[in-house]
Amino acid sequence: MRLFSALLLTGALCLSSPAFAVSLDGFDEKEKATRLSIMQRLNPFVEERKQEGTAPLITFEELRARLTLEQGSFLEEFRKMDPAAVGGASRRLPAPAPDTLFARLDRQVVLRDGKPVRVDTQFLPTPAYEAYARMMAAMEQDLGKRLLVESGYRSPAYQLFLFLFYMPKHSYSVRETNRHVALPGCSEHGSPPFQAIDFITPGGINGEDRPEEFEELQEYGWLHARAKEFGFFLSYPRPSAGSGQGESAFEPWHWHYEEPGALL
């Protein structure tokens, strides 16, 4: 386990150009074009950081340095969005302290189409990592199985990149995308006191395309029975009947660790 310090993982974009009024229910053609131009500039940089194993630690300053003022203003609108106006379970969460230490996980391997594939390097704050390690030791003792970390800590800047990346899958709607990918500053993945982990089996099951596939796992039943002993809780259970479209989607793979005494 290697430790990394959270240096400046959150920061302000210094902008002077006029602000956009981003459409929440579906981008118009200009907004789609702006998003596309941003992704074309950022994709090579993010891919390079993935190869280095440091994509989850990307800062807003690093994103901004690769964008025009107009593109930066567009990003800033997402950072300023009121979670209550967007809907779902969004809420502002505590940012990482500058002295937060992270464990680096870079030797995880899963099967994809029957072939071993290395999981992108992941990071977890040390308290969450230590609790995860204890929990997996107990699961292995009980079941002879364990779960891997498909996604751990993600800086707010990386979270914003992912939000934009997944928007086409959700009809370019901010509200609908937010049901599946939290806004920057609102994701448990970016808040060490409530650190999220997206689990995946060594066999490659993560439930992303069919949540029921993960829900049916013996490991999922074990988590329901024992995860709380280690400080982990399911973040997005099945929406109750008649709860409406605004509620966050069911994510059986997404659990978060709560540091003792952590308060919103």
What is each residue range found by the language model?
Residues R154-L160:
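Short, well-ordered surface patches within globular domains
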Residues S16-S17:
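N-terminal signal peptide c-region/cleavage motif recognized by signal peptidases
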Residues F20-S151, F165-L264:
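Extracytoplasmic cell-surface/polysaccharide-interacting catalytic and binding patches
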Residues L8-L9, L13:
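Hydrophobic helical h-region of N-terminal Sec-dependent signal peptides
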Residues M1-L7:
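Bacterial N-terminal signal peptides that target proteins for export
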